């Protein structure tokens, strides 16, 4: 499938899905990718790649001169990300690794320009610490979180490690749903997008 636009936000229904595998929804994904500030040729790491929606869109943004690494502890997620990458024709500049963060991150022999941390890992502090070791100077880290505890732990860890220009954005999305008498707005769970830079 070809995504012919130069902006992120591929509709969710364009991706192959699995009910057991989480997906970063299109509006949140578009905001998270904008916070990453991806450039052509960047090296990107997607920790907790899930369905591969962020991996695929990041790959489209970095182009053929960049590379995106997708990491997930679930084999089903790795396989689903692979299928979605094939569907969008970007598998050639994606590397998929099965393993659990933060441990698996130290086996990757690369430094990254941008790191996206999706989902709600209990090891968020350790993952942020590992990210500091493998991100280039001037690199950006963006985290999506649902739980307030994850937000608190992430901000605390980022401040203590030395990330600068920290931002937190709370996003509440409501989508229209047709009913018998009109359109009702259905609110999704609030998502927090946390970002920071390594100086």
Curated annotation (Swiss-Prot):
Keywords: Cobalamin biosynthesis, Methyltransferase, S-adenosyl-L-methionine, Transferase. Its EC number is 2.1.1.196. It comes from the Archaea. CDD domains: AdoMet_MTases (cd02440). It holds the Pfam family Methyltransf_31. Pathway: Cofactor biosynthesis; adenosylcobalamin biosynthesis; cob(II)yrinate a,c-diamide from sirohydrochlorin (anaerobic route): step 8/10. This is Probable cobalt-precorrin-6B C(15)-methyltransferase (decarboxylating). It comes from Saccharolobus islandicus (strain Y.N.15.51 / Yellowstone #2). The gene is cbiT.
